[in-house]
Structures are given as structure tokens and as C-alpha cells.
Amino acid sequence: MYVVNPQLVVLVDKDQEILDVLYLTLYDGIDERSSMYYFIKNHLRVPMDRVRVLKKHIILTLKISQVKGYICDLLNIDEEIIIYSHKNNLEYSYVDNTTFNPFTMTQRKTLLKSKSFLYNVYVDACNFLVIWVAKAADTMVKELGSYEEVDANVLKFESRLIEMFPDLDLDFTVESKFNNVFRTNLKMTGLKNIVLSNTDKKILFIKSDEYFINLSGNHFVINDESLNLSIWDDDGSLAISSDGNTITVNNVKLFTDMIPNNNVQMERIKSDITYKVKLSTPITSKVKLDIETSFIFIETATNNILLSVDKKISIILAKNHISIKVKNHIPNIEKYFTFLVVFINRLFNTVKQSMDFTKIETIYWSRICQNTKDKNRKPVIISSLEPDMLKVSDNFYKSPTKEVFVNNNEVMFTCDDKTGKYNNIGFLAIFYKLQKICIPCCFLKNQSHTDTFMACVHNKQTDKNIISPYILNYGKVVTDSKIAFLPPIFNDFFNSDLSISLESDNKRLKSTKGYHVIRSCLHNCRYYTLKRIRTKNDIIQFVNTENVTLIANDIVYFPMKYSSINNKIYILVQEIVHEIVIAKKEEDKDMIYFEELRTNKLRDMFPYKVKTVDIKEQNGLKLTTDGFYVDGELFTEPLSTKRSVFMDNISTQNNPIVKYFNSVFKYVVTDNKEIFIKTWVINTMLKLGIGKDYTHIQIKSILEKYYKL
């Protein structure tokens, strides 16, 4: 549980004698376990009965001028003041960063005035903020004093914060990831020693020039660097990377475990830190800020991304976590910003901590249940039942003209469409399926036959094996009891010789002897539903790791090897993997049956179909165009990190191997096609023993022997 630390304001006279001590806190009374209590008792040596305890809080995102205005108001001072600190520079600082004190000024150093923000100037503000105040006239440098008016919006914000603070859930956990770049003395020998010390991580050391490539490690991939060390984490992310002059460290623990000795010199060049904060209570990810909070955060064009007031810290909001990226380390700033986000989220969003939307009288319905010019779908709240209403269940009542649903908090909902069309109460199926929440909405037709209605009104759970005959249009995420049409281009491809019978006025399935449809992966491929496939990189990794055929945005993605393609075909809908199956239904029966695909009709589209040809075989070792085999088994063991491999470097310009495979390369999907082609050419040369001195005619003859396109 995060605790917002107390703050201290100390007013002194011309002799630096303490006149007033204000202990600012959002809790009740002085926390005797806090470092602030220890500071008052042992350093200020002020009796506790002289300390004024106020339910106040100096917001750390304020500019120094705003802080002065707040303090003038707090102390009821209407003359010029100077604020300073005993351990940090605040309003003023010397050029050599000596701590400024208005009572011990020196003319021999250049003085700088800060116009920045409190958390940037006072680096420990989140943990231990002590502001000393002196009237300018009482100091040696009264010309440095100023008076600032308090910002009324700051006081208004503080008032709401104090009022709502007891209800805030500040239970969260923080994970951090450092992205550090250092200048280092780890040259080629030092990097090689790291490779030699490696035991289990994916690692690559590469040195290349115009003529040769030297590789060592256990994960041989080519890159554009003349000298590079790369080490990957278990999840495939890059943990450490170095070019011999600088080193980027994304996993600090791994780096400290692998450095060969203590003589490594590290000079920080730049760093940023990403904090991932996991929340115990969900928030609303889309926040619309009031203009009165411009001193807290800055809105961006994307309403789930906020910026700090200095635009150096970015905050990404999600339902159950917050990501905070900072340029430089500020102690506990991620926790303080999370505290502000939780408060602002509660302040500006009606949907608060409860996941039951209907607990709140001012209801913000989903977009799929909202009023438009000609539709009134949002239910209204009423205070009582009409006399002619009959009880249908414990929470549902009905009359000839009206239906009423009563939620768990005894709030009554009914439909009141003036046109008389949308007067049938139903429930939003998506919310019930995902969260078991019954959220009413008004429908054109009677909903009493639907699964969600039966569950919400009669507490009858449906058989999950029963599939709804209504076929969704492509583009919607398919739940476990639904099916959907394929995109038009693929619907024509898969179902050109198949037939389907639908009811005339809707898309309800009457019968089919077999028709390709989209089904949720919750049945046969539940593991895939846990994956979010967002980027091209995600698609490439998924297809090649799982050896599957995937349709995404009208493009078919195959794994690298033709032999890896099986009969299963998957399709991406809103970043979620679904499967393609064959649906069957008899006209006189309700049950819909599914068959898995017996053949992969897309396999014939694969652009690179060549037979595996043996290149060389000896003593149980066999090299083929499809890989290297030991006693008939494909060799997949990681290479030794203690061995180096030398090979010729090549150019892809006017290369005969590139020209030969050009018809294949145009179908390749990758982030760096040039590196892919270069890797392909080098692998082909190594497999077939092709030297750099071979003529174009010789190379073409060899390729035609082993790779007949």
C-alpha cells in the first residue's frame, strides 16, 4: 500500500529562529514512524505541541512560482518571501550546485534562479519535502524575494483530493525496466570473454568487414554492425547489446552476472526507465482531463496517454496497470504519479472502482447501447412499479406495455422509447460473457429467448456446447458460442463450391452440409487466445514458432518451410487468434457440428515448393537442402559459445543467387529484407560449397540441380 509522505513548511525570522512549523499530511495526525517525525524531534528540536498539523498537500508537479503562491496563502503572508531548503536547492542555486541559503550569501559564485517544477528541482520531494521560508526583508538578499498569488485551481484541486483521499485504493505493485546506455572499456577482448562465460542465454558475437564475417555464440544471426555483442532474455527480448564503444543494458542483473571482472569502466551516456505499475483496483483507461488540472498532467491526442507538465514523463493507462516512462531517475516519482492518476481517474470518471456499472445512478453505458437521433436504447431509472405489473422472476416485472428489471442494488430500469420501437429489455451479452454482469439495454425485438436474458432473469446457465445459429459478420471477436463469416475474399475462396441456407430476413443458419466459418479458439486452441498479435513482428514470430498458417488483413502468412505447413488455418480478428472450421447443420435439428479442416487449401499458394535434396552424407551425418541430420534426426541443438565460425562476406548487388531466388523473395515478410536475403545467400553458399570465385554460370548450374523452382 503506497503511503503519501508528509511534508514540512518551516518559517524563520531574521535570526533564523523558527517561528512556525507546519506538518502537511493527507492522513490524521503525525506519523511517528515517519522520517519527518524523526527530523522534527532530533534536528529541529521543536516540541510537538508547537507543530501545526494541517490536512494539506503541496502538489509536486507545481512550478516553483506556483509553490510560492501556495505557501504565501498557507502562511497568510502578503509580502515578498524566499523559499529554500537545508539539503536541496529550490528557488535559487549556485552554478557549482552548492546549496543556497539566503542568510549566508556569497558574491563570489554565480546565482541561478529556477523556473522549473518542484519534483525536478527537489529530487527527493516524493520522500522527504522540507521547505524553509523567510521573509525577503529579513535576509541579506531581499532583492531576491517575490510575492506570488495562489492559483485558485490548485486550491480547488487540493480540496477535492483531501475530500476523496480516504476512498482511494493505493494498493499497487511496481516493476521497473532500465534502458541504460554506457560508454565502456569493454572492447573486442572483453566482449569475447562475456561470450565464453555464457552458459544458457542466447548470445551472438559478430565481427565483420568487407571480406569476412566472424561469428561466435549460440544464436547465429547476421546484423549490420561491424562489431556487435547481443544477448537475449528468455522471453526473446534484447537484454544486452554492445558495439565495443558503448553498451546498452536492458537487464541490469544479467549484466552484473556476466561481466568478466570488476575492472569494467562504465560511464553513463543516457538512460530511461519504464515502470509498470500493477493496480489492485481497475481504473478507466480513457481519461478526459479538466482544464483546471493543467498543472498536473498534459493531455495528448490519445486519451489513454498523459504527459507530465514538463513533457519528459509519459504515462500510458490501461484497465489494470499503468506504464510510466521517465528520462532520469527521480526517487519514487512513479508511485507519486500513480497516486495522482488514481485520484484523477476517480475524480473525472463516473465508472469507478466497482465493475458493476449499475451500482451508479448516473450510468455510462457501453457504446453498443446508446441513444441516437432515431433510437432510444438506453434504459431509464424509475422509482416504483406500476400496479398492473406481473412478477416474471425475482428481478423482472412485466405489463402489456412495459418491462422492468431490478438489479442487485434494487435500482429499477425500464425502456421508454417515445417511438414505441425499443421497449424490450435485454442485456449486453459481451459484458455477461466476460464479467457475468447483467447490464440492461433496450431492444427492437423481445429478448426473452436469448441466453443472456435466461441467465440474468431466470438464473439459467446455457449449455456451452450449444452454438448460436446467428452468423456474425467478419470483424467481431467470436465468443465460444458464436460463429462468424470469413472476409469476402476468403469466403469466396473457401466456400465457392459449398452451399448454405439462411433464414430470409436475417443471417440465422438453417442448414448446410459443410461451410467454412470462423470459430473461437477457446475450444481447440485456447493457448492461442492468450496471445495478442499486434505487429508484423508478432505475426512472423507466431507463424514460425507455431508452424501455422495465419490470415491477417487479407494476407496469408506461412511458416518458412513448406514441410511445416499442416491442415490447420487460423485468422486474426482484432488482434485475437481464431480458427477456421467447417460448420454442419441439418434443417430439422438445432445442433451445429464442427469438423476440423482435412486439407489446407491455402497450401497450394505457398511460393517456395522444392523437394528436399541430399547434398552430402557420411558416417550418419547428412546435409540436405532442408537442414542437417544426425542419424536421421534433424540437428537442432544450440551451437557452442566457445567456437568461432569464419565465412566470406558477400554483397547482394548483382548477386547470381539473389537473381535466382528473386521470385521467392518478393513474397517474404520481414522487418529487414536486405538482411534476410544476405542470410539466405550465405546459407546457400555454405550448404552447397559455393565460393566467391565461382562464375554466374557455375552458380546457376548448381542451384538448378538442388533447387528446382
UniProtKB/Swiss-Prot annotation:
Principal location class: virion
GO molecular function terms listed in the Swiss-Prot or TrEMBL record: DNA binding
Domain of life (superkingdom): Viruses
Subcellular location: Virion
GO biological process terms held by the UniProt record: positive regulation of DNA-templated transcription
Family: Belongs to the poxviridae VETF large subunit family.
Subunit record text: Heterodimer of a 70 kDa and a 82 kDa subunit. Part of the early transcription complex composed of ETF, RAP94, and the DNA-directed RNA polymerase.
Name of the molecule in the record: Early transcription factor 82 kDa subunit
Source organism of the structure: Fowlpox virus (strain NVSL) (FPV)
